[in-house]
């Protein structure tokens, strides 16, 4: 039997549907601060990446491609008998969401992505940062490597997360297998979506956590020559949906229900 992404739903199926996809080293716990309010206004679908949360980790490397993720999102939509839905991609999932919206624009009522260096970061800069991280990691693997805390993106280093949410996200990241991390990295380069922005036809918005300074550099470059690019600044950092949950929730309702 073919592996399928794990997903769950909350809210009234008669309401407008909204797909939420979390980022790397995370799980559906990413959306904990958003579900009470969004679940009142939408039929929320939460999907987990391969090897994250309760999603399986396929053996075949061919499953770790953009087209396969796009097909999985379509499978979920079809299985739920939804004609269309809004799509939100957080961090690593931003590139996946953009590719899905371009492949199936007729199914997407609107697209929102959050801060994402994998989708919008300068490739040359990313290479330098990766080399620097590898240098640091080589000298500090020991105990930290056992629970992935040698990775700079591990949520243990997040400074603005509520304690209960942080505890769940840290547990998710600690328990990620090395195989899941390595396979998830197979599509890292393919996630870069800067060249695709102008091909997005559904309504599109970037929910920008202004405290992540490195992403502001990427965003400034994205805005150049794109005066119509919709960006909503929020008082949060990389995990803007958590750190600025009230702003994020209100913006999602406005964007998807009152465009």
Locate each region found by the language model.
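Post-His helix in hydrolase/transferase enzymes
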Residues: 242-254
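Conserved alpha/beta-hydrolase catalytic His-Asp/Glu region
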Residues: 122-128, 142-198
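Conserved loop-alpha-helix segment in the C-terminal half of the alpha/beta-hydrolase fold
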Residues: 203-236, 242
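Flexible "cap/lid" loop of the alpha/beta hydrolase fold
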Residues: 98-103, 109-141
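Active-site loop/oxyanion-hole signature of alpha/beta-hydrolase fold enzymes
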Residues: 8, 45-92, 250
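Structural signature of beta-strand start/N-cap positions in the alpha/beta core
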Residues: 17, 43, 83-86, 107-110, ...
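Conserved HGGG/HGGXW glycine-rich cap/lid loop of the alpha/beta-hydrolase fold
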Residues: 5-62, 222
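Alpha/beta-hydrolase fold catalytic core
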Residues: 1-19, 39-43, 78, 82-83, ...
């Amino acid at each position: 039997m073919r592996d399928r992404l794990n997903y769950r739903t909350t809210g009234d199926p008669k309401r407008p549907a909204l797909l939420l996809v979390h980022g790397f080293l995370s799980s559906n716990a990413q959306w904990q601060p958003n579900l009470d309010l969004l679940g009142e206004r939408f039929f929320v679908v939460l999907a987990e990446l391969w090897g994250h949360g309760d999603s399986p980790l396929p053996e075949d490397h061919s499953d770790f491609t953009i087209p396969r993720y796009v097909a999985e999102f379509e499978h979920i939509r079809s299985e739920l008998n939804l004609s269309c839905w809004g799509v939100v991609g957080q961090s690593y999932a931003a590139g996946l969401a953009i590719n899905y919206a371009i492949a199936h624009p007729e199914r997407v009522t609107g697209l929102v992505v959050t801060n994402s260096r994998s989708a919008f970061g300068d490739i040359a800069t990313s290479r330098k940062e990766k080399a620097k991280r590898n240098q640091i990691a080589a000298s500090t693997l020991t105990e930290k490597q056992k629970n992935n805390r040698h990775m700079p993106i591990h949520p243990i280093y997040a400074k603005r997360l509520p304690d209960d949410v942080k505890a769940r996200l840290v547990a998710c990241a600690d328990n990620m297998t090395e195989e899941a991390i390595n396979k998830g990295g197979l599509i890292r380069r393919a996630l870069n979506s800067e060249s695709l922005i102008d091909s997005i036809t559904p309504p599109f918005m970037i929910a920008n956590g202004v405290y992540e300074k490195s992403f502001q550099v990427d965003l400034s470059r994205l805005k150049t020559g794109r005066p119509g690019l919709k960006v909503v600044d929020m008082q949060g950092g990389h995990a803007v949906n958590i750190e600025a949950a009230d702003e994020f929730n209100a913006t999602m309702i406005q964007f998807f229900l009152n465009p």
